[in-house]
Amino acid sequence: FTFSGHMVGAFISLVKCPDGDGLVFSGDVSGHNQETTQGVKTLSESFLEMAKFRECRRIILITEATNGNRDQEEGREKMDARLKAVLCETERKGGNALLPVFMVNRGPNIVAKLVRLGFKVFVAGGVRKTLAIEVGQKLLDKWLADGTVMLIKNGDDYEQQIRNAAHGQYGFRPIVTSSATLDQGAGVDFAIEMLPVQENVLISTGHRFDGSAMKEFFEIKNKPLGPGHTIVLNRMDRNFRSVKHAVNVRCSGHHFDYTAHSYRKELVTLATGLNPDVVFVKHCTEDGFKGLESALRSELGEKCPPISWARHLNLFEL
């Protein structure tokens, strides 16, 4: 096993089979650095040598292609500067920022990024559980002690804390909470309070799934407001029943591509460095598969190995 760069604890598995084949399961992989992890561009030859992996009869790579159809469009430093500018302008206008995130990986990464950029942060939802694991308990304790980070507390005043944070009663503190889809989690409670306020901003930092409330927000936010220009959010009541809330969207919205998955060029670098005899591609759309397949064929030409899309329940002959 070796680290994959995707998130704390993610790993690439190398398996030597009795028939002499060597299997490499990349899992989710990231070739670029994040706030809490260092990217992994290639597998080191010294690591492969430890298990005599180059001596395998064949090397079979099973990898992902979440971003197989696209390369990085905006550098991280430029993106960070744009994020800081958006937040500073929001504070100047008297608004607040809501950043719905995936609780694992993205949440701790975004909290760490906001702190590095000089902001105090309010954290809610499942991110409270993953933050200490991914940034470290010692650092989190420091942030809590000096007031850099506030965690929402369970209790009778839970809903009041949501309203206070949403309306700036704790000062300007961007709110980081799950879930990134806006279909569930504490993010829905904050969105109900914040989306109707023109001075606020909703910030997306990850993939926007088709059919999700987050995707719908970015499809309507620039349209004239009026009847029908709302999104319906599903909020859990005290009895854990889903209740629909129609929310009129008046705040602005911005997307930042802080993906934790390798881009196309990074996937090509990983594959070509390994020099596999067979490649299977999973965890992707058809566009993602075709994008990576085309890039590998362009890079390797006649030396390109067979490449197959590893769709669910499809059989392949090795």
Residue spans for each PLM region:
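Short, well-ordered alpha-helical microsegments
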Residues: 10, 33, 107-110, 183-185, ...
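Hard-cation-handling environments
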Residues: 81-213, 221, 282
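Active-site neighborhood of phospho(di)ester-bond hydrolases with catalytic His/Asp-centered motifs
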Residues: 3-4, 24-29, 62-66, 98-102, ...
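Proline-aspartate-enriched helix->loop->beta-strand connector
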Residues: 271, 275-281
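His/Asp/Glu-rich metal-coordinating catalytic cores
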Residues: 1-116, 120-124, 138, 143-146
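Redox- and metal-dependent alpha/beta enzyme cores, enriched for Fe-S-associated oxidoreductases
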Residues: 195-251
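Short acidic, glycine/proline-enriched helix-loop-strand junctions
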Residues: 279, 288-316
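A short, acidic, amphipathic alpha-helical segment used as a generic capping/interface helix at domain edges
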Residues: 185-194, 259-273
